[in-house]
Amino acid sequence: MANDAAACAERATNDMLIGPDWAINIELCDLINMDPSQAKEAVKVLKKRLGSKNSKVQILALYALETLSKNCGENVYQLIIDRGLLNDMVKIVKKKPELNVREKILTLLDTWQEAFGGRGGRYPQYYNAYNDLRSAGIEFPPRTESSLSFFTPPQTQPDEDAAIQASLQGDDASSLSLEEIQSAEGSVDVLMDMLGAHDPGNPESLKEEVIVDLVEQCRTYQRRVMTLVNTTTDEELLCQGLALNDNLQHVLQRHDDIANVGSVPSNGRNTRAPPPVQIVDINHDDEDDESDDEFARLAHRSSTPTRRPVHGSDSGMVDILSGDVYKPQGNSSSQGVKKPPPPPPHTSSSSSSPVFDDASPQQSKSSEVIRNLPPPPSRHNQRQQFFEHHHSSSGSDSSYEGQTRNLSLTSSEPQKEEKPEDLLFKDLVEFAKTRSSKANNNNRSL
């Protein structure tokens, strides 16, 4: 035990240290306070280290001596005087040592003599050493505020008990009671409701004073809950504290998420549905509809010329007796066509636009025209009955001749029609040939 403090002083002034090792210095103070008899050996080691030629060892010895004077009391003050450390320090300053060593010695001497009351104080030896250097014309560094409270009395057992008691009271103050847990739950509910009503398009609303205060309260409650969980032995209080901690974490996490989303271009309610893409699509739909309508109109306008019958085509039907050409009304052009009476409401000889009629009237009119046409010569009996029926009902074909005489295959180039007399002559010749061939067949069979 007698060598513990001395060995600690050796380690505190080891030249391998970069700077003062405060853990070793405090350990040295504890050893001397537990056994004041070891102070003598420790001061002896420090005196030896102070006379070293290595400035690093000297500065380490001065720091260790300063630590002992602040923490070990009257025994060390007297040992510094008795061991002649004050005279050694004055000699070192007069020899002009390293600047840091010189400044440290001057600061210690000035602080000590001021703390002990100067010339008329308890230890006038400190003042004498100070005055000796001052008389030699050596300027002392200016005093600092830390030098005024240089000495601190050694800590005693009652003080330690008081510190422990204060620490326990602080822990009790930071814990939570059942009433405070209920109050914290109310704060959590209010903050959750306010975050639920938060407008994502207005991130500044999170900076409202009420929300800021509630968030701060919740964070304070969270710290106190952690202290409660780690210290309490009440199971009911522990369960409620854990439940409160979960709610606090949930609401604070939601607040942080909203704050993070608001700080970045967010996809909040207003920013998540920007209209530009939809507006562009709608405009494109309108343009497509308009273009489709225009295309349909152009298609209808161009469909009539492309469907015009070519000369010599079989699209029309010719009445052999009258020589007139009949066309189905669906394929006929609106120009130059005179409709049979009664005229339809959409017929106009001067209109250049296409006429769109319903399919059912066109089909009925076309079928009516087809029924008025005679059968082909190959069907002789039906053709003869058709002519007899027509002569008996109308007496002549003059009405159809008058109605269809001016019909043409195309509106631009009227077709050259054959004379009715020629057509009638051809039809009669063909009819006579048919009768003669049938008569010959009958004679052969007889």
Curated annotation (Swiss-Prot):
InterPro entries: ENTH_VHS (IPR008942), GAT_dom (IPR004152), GAT_sf (IPR038425), TOL_plant (IPR044836), TOM1 (IPR014645), VHS_dom (IPR002014). It is found in: Cytoplasm; Membrane. Residues 172-260 form the GAT domain. Residues 12-141 form the VHS domain. Keywords: Cytoplasm, Membrane, Phosphoprotein, Protein transport, Transport. Residues 347-361 have a biased composition (Low complexity). Residues 260-423 are annotated as: Disordered. Pfam families: GAT, VHS. Residues 414-423 have a biased composition (Basic and acidic residues). It is a peripheral membrane protein. GO terms for biological process: protein transport to vacuole involved in ubiquitin-dependent protein catabolic process via the multivesicular body sorting pathway. The keyword tRNA-binding does not apply. Residues 400-413 have a biased composition (Polar residues). GO terms for cellular component: cytoplasm; membrane. GO terms for molecular function: phosphatidylinositol binding; ubiquitin binding. Residues 284-293 have a biased composition (Acidic residues). Ubiquitously expressed. The modification Phosphoserine is found at residues 291, 366. SMART domains: VHS. Belongs to the TOM1 family. Might contribute to the loading of the ESCRT machinery. This is TOM1-like protein 4. It comes from Arabidopsis thaliana (Mouse-ear cress). The lineage of its organism: Eukaryota, Viridiplantae, Streptophyta, Embryophyta, Tracheophyta.
